[in-house]
Amino acid sequence: MGLEEKLPSGFLLTTVEQAAGWVRKSSVFPATFGLACCAIEMMTTGAGRYDLARFGMEVFRGSPRQADLMIVAGRVSQKMAPVLRQVYDQMPNPKWVISMGVCASSGGMFNNYAIVQGVDHVVPVDIYLPGCPPRPEMLMDAILKLHQKIQSSKLGVNAEEAAREAEEAALKALPTIEMKGLLR
């Protein structure tokens, strides 16, 4: 996104990468993409009792251009999938995605043609959060695991190429569940 992509690979020391990772993980700005009942638990996590501000997430961003984390909470319909992808494409790099709830991760109990059977077919997902709906403590644990992933992410020329390859691999992956039952 900036100067770190212009540096040759191997130029940055690990301590500088660790410092940059600490800065990135301490200032993650989430964008809400609440689509169903999981969004209620996501809003609860942002309230005073759970206090996401101590993790650097003061407020959920209303614009994708100001966010670097998308929390997809709930089922995604086929008509909503292009909108989800457009919002993801508008986010600046580096960007991360948490798939919150079983509906976002695999379609959940909505095993039909109208629901995307896993949001990972639309955008690359970094953390899967199971549950129907997951508790706020589980979302906080997923955020902490994402912080660990951000802390260990590399900088430099190879970072953008690695992100592109990971996105292509995620979008070409086989479905996470098999359509069966009355529909097939």
UniProtKB/Swiss-Prot annotation:
It catalyses: a quinone + NADH + 5 H(+)(in) = a quinol + NAD(+) + 4 H(+)(out). Its EC number is 7.1.1.-. GO terms for cellular component: plasma membrane; respiratory chain complex I. It is a peripheral membrane protein. Its cofactor is [4Fe-4S] cluster. SUPFAM superfamilies: HydA/Nqo6-like (SSF56770). It is found in: Cell membrane. The keyword Cell membrane applies. The keyword Manganese does not apply. PROSITE patterns: COMPLEX1_20K. Pfam families: Oxidored_q6. [4Fe-4S] cluster binds at residues 37-38, 103, 132. Keywords: 4Fe-4S, Cell membrane, Iron, Iron-sulfur, Membrane, Metal-binding, NAD, Quinone, Translocase, Transport. GO terms for biological process: aerobic respiration; electron transport coupled proton transport. Binds 1 [4Fe-4S] cluster. One of its GO terms (molecular function) is quinone binding. Its main location: membrane. Belongs to the complex I 20 kDa subunit family. PANTHER family: NADH DEHYDROGENASE (PTHR11995), NADH DEHYDROGENASE [UBIQUINONE] IRON-SULFUR PROTEIN 7, MITOCHONDRIAL (PTHR11995:SF14). NDH-1 is composed of 14 different subunits. Subunits NuoB, C, D, E, F, and G constitute the peripheral sector of the complex. NDH-1 shuttles electrons from NADH, via FMN and iron-sulfur (Fe-S) centers, to quinones in the respiratory chain. The immediate electron acceptor for the enzyme in this species is believed to be a menaquinone. Couples the redox reaction to proton translocation (for every two electrons transferred, four hydrogen ions are translocated across the cytoplasmic membrane), and thus conserves the redox energy in a proton gradient. This is NADH-quinone oxidoreductase subunit B 1. It comes from Streptomyces coelicolor (strain ATCC BAA-471 / A3(2) / M145). The gene is nuoB1.
